[in-house]
Amino acid sequence: MSIKFWMNKEGRKPANTKRKAYLFTLGSFVTMFFVLCISPVFSGATYKFEEMKIGEYQSLSSTVKIAVAKKEYNPDNQTLRIDYELRADNDSQILSNMKYKVENKYIKQKDNNVKTKVYRASDNYIVVISENVPEEFGVVSSVVKPEYIHPELQNDVDDLKERSMKMYVLENEKLINRELKKKSKDFYEREYLAFSQQALRKEIEKKMEDKSSAMKQLKIKNEQLTKEMEYQTEGEKVKTKNTINSNESTINNHQKEIDVLKEDIKMKEKKIQLLDEKKKTI
């Protein structure tokens, strides 16, 4: 009797084990389904798209990097503008032999109705205009694909093969510019030239401010050293005088550099003036 009971018990053991394994697997599946599919509905969770920051460079190829320079949207005419700036680390000439295909799509897009055009403002700057991007577009994915204009001029013609960069534009009030509309290639070229000249001028002015501040601090230091010399020994006076002379030399060098920077600003202003005159003739 005990042997029969023992055999039944041993016979049921595999069945119980299989049943437990089955229930465990089923429970795990239900839990995962709830987490992935049902939970977001109740919690209000949404997918997160990481937006590329302005001026943040990413690799487009082994030698070329790309960054978003501007993002604007006009809901009135459903126009989206994305500007990209490019730079080459080792060979700046390579940018003149590159062109770009850009595909912009909004997240709920079903038809291929978004019209996108790429304008080459300079070798290192492109303006991408997309039309028919509806208000409340949510998220736009922008894919940039580089190509060589003349592949035969490159040492490695496969360098750009299957290369691309994808970024997202999130719907935001800060994007809105109700004056935005599609312009001509000439307009974007002039706009970029004027912008780059102004940026260079600001950079030069910042350098001038830094050098002027350094000169001011050195002059104050020399005044303090001159007063201290009244209470110093002859040996100490010699060392202090040498320090003052060194500071004076640095001040003079700063002044010369400031004069050169002032001339640079005059040249930039002249270029901007010529650019304005060119605008009037077009």
Swiss-Prot record:
Main subcellular localisation: membrane
Bilayer topology: Single-pass membrane protein
* Membrane-spanning ranges: 22-42
Q: Which domain of life is it from?
A: Bacteria
Q: Which GO terms describe its cellular component?
A: plasma membrane
Q: Name where it's found.
A: Cell membrane
Record key words, sorted: Cell membrane, Membrane, Plasmid, Transmembrane, Transmembrane helix
Q: What is this protein called?
A: Uncharacterized protein pXO2-05/BXB0004/GBAA_pXO2_0004
